[in-house]
């Protein structure tokens, strides 16, 4: 068994038999995350004598995805299993080693995916209550909630991790339409933004201090998970911009106009400072890495359209130069495909998604993974385990790309909080013949399915009662607005030219 990644966790149950009578071992005060187990001391033990019991919070399944690509479907299934294995009373980072903690960064990164797949509202609202309770008087957010570490490092403000205070409530509002989530969390959100704005000072740049940065990007050495290519100051200032925008919007929605204006101005100042300090007039971003372009594009940190388009082209060039291999860590991974899509680089996004060589989303699948790994190479191509300390085999953060599968590959996304309005915008590729997603929204089941066959694209959309949808049919000049019910389109296959040209996804 590969137990080294467990670190100090023994992950061992010892049972002393009382006598010859039949006994059942089922520990009730612990749980173990594992794929393989070893049993000793039981003669004539058969596989059928052992029953594996899945432990997790009993969350209602609300989201599904499928496609014609077997590896892609297995990736999505791995995301589902990592969600099940880590949402146990609270959103943990991993279920097996000597942590099993509610890491804030992991939770906010994975939030959009988790809230599509399962009804996590109750669990995450409870966790946010704990976050607010654990928040320090100065507004700093501990790195794990509940804060079992309680040391000076764990309460040092860290970008992306502490920003769970703003991003998770905003994600829940977007998925449920429930303003009470924002109302309850607004003091916590405000305290966090005020704290990091103070750290940034009058120049509005969050510089220095402790940062995780783009945690565990592929260039980080096994012994140095902090060793990402991206300048942590870029990551930190980008998150100050994001959180101040969320706070301003939340205050506006709740009718706190003066507060909304205050944080709107802060957001404008941070965005201007980011552009001045980190972006060239031609659209190059400091560190010149996939993650910084993903952040700048996805979070609207580039003041001019020509910079945005140049950044998209540069991001695509970096992906090509890497052989269509991923080069992002925890921070950039949820955003990189969106950034490529938003700047007209959909073909590059698909080639990145469907890459099977290491590092990539599908590489672990080719190695037999059944959950999402903490590192892109938790297992090396030769079958050896990465020697680094951070080598979990069930860690959902890098699976955040599933949100892009739902919204872009299948094409199902909320256009208004709580799915009161849907945007259906499937973006097919020649590499897939079909894709589908469905979600149990507050209004009922919404679904999208498309299939390419015989030179045609067949699109089926189901809109629940009480909701509407804006449908972007591939090849059509304008979207169509539809009400509840099932709607079908049969149009020319937009990928037919790619197929005739012999399109493929090379490694």
Q: Locations of the language-model features?
A:
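Non-catalytic C-terminal accessory modules of carbohydrate-active enzymes
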Residues: 264-265, 347-507
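Alpha-helical support elements that line or immediately flank enzyme active sites
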Residues: 26-29, 40, 105-135, 166-182, ...
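Surface-exposed acidic, glycine/proline-enriched linker/cap segments
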Residues: 76, 80, 219-229, 376-391
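Extended, well-ordered alpha-helical scaffold segments
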Residues: 75-78, 120-131, 179-197, 250-275, ...
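Extracellular/oxidizing-compartment recognition motifs
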Residues: 1-97, 105-106, 122-125, 138, ...
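Repeat-solenoid scaffold signature
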Residues: 321-367
């Amino acid at each position: 068994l590969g137990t080294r990644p467990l670190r100090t966790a023994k992950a061992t149950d010892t049972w002393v038999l009382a006598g010859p009578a039949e006994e059942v071992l089922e520990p009730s005060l612990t749980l173990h995350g594992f794929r393989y187990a070893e049993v000793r001391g039981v003669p004539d033990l058969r596989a059928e004598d052992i029953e594996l019991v899945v432990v997790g919070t009993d969350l209602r399944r609300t989201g599904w995805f499928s496609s014609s690509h077997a590896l892609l479907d297995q990736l999505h299934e791995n995301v589902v299993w990592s969600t099940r294995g880590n949402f146990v009373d609270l959103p943990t980072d991993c279920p097996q080693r000597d942590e099993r903690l509610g890491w804030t960064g992991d939770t906010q990164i994975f939030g959009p995916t988790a809230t599509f797949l399962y009804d996590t509202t109750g669990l995450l609202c409870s966790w946010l209550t704990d976050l607010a309770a654990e928040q320090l008087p100065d507004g700093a957010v501990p790195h794990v909630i509940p804060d079992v570490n309680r040391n000076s490092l764990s309460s040092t403000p860290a970008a992306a991790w502490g920003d769970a205070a703003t991003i998770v409530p905003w994600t829940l509002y977007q998925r449920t339409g429930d303003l009470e989530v924002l109302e309850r969390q607004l003091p916590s959100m405000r305290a966090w933004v005020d704290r990091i704005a103070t750290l940034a000072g009058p120049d509005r740049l969050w510089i220095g201090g402790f940062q995780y940065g783009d945690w565990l990007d592929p260039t980080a050495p096994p012994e140095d998970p902090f060793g990402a290519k991206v300048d942590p100051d870029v990551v930190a200032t980008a998150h100050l911009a994001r959180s101040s925008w969320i706070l301003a919007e939340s205050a506006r929605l709740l009718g706190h106009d003066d507060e909304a204006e205050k944080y709107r101005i802060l957001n404008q100042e941070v965005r201007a400072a980011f552009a001045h300090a980190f972006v060239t007039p031609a659209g190059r971003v400091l560190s010149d890495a996939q993650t910084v372009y993903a952040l700048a594009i996805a979070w609207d940190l580039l003041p001019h359209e020509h910079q945005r388009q140049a950044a998209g082209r540069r991001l695509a060039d970096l992906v090509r130069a890497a052989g269509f291999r991923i080069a992002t860590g925890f921070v950039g991974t949820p955003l990189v495909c969106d950034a490529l899509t938003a700047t007209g680089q959909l073909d590059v996004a698909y080639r990145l998604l469907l890459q099977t060589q290491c590092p990539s989303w599908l590489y672990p699948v080719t190695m037999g993974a059944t959950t999402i790994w903490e590192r892109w190479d938790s297992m090396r191509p030769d079958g050896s385990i990465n020697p680094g300390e951070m080598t979990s085999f069930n860690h959902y953060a890098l699976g955040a790309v599933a949100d892009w599968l739902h919204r872009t590959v299948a094409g199902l996304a909320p256009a208004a909080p709580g799915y009161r309005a849907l945007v259906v915008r499937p973006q097919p590729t020649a590499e897939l013949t079909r894709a589908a997603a469905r979600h149990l929204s507050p209004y009922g089941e919404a679904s999208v399915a498309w299939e390419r066959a015989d030179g045609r694209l067949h699109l089926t959309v189901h809109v629940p009662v009480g909701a509407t949808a804006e449908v972007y049919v591939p090849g059509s000049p304008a979207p169509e607005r539809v009400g509840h019910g099932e709607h079908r389109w049969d149009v020319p296959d937009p990928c037919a030219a790619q197929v005739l040209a012999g399109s493929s996804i090379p490694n």
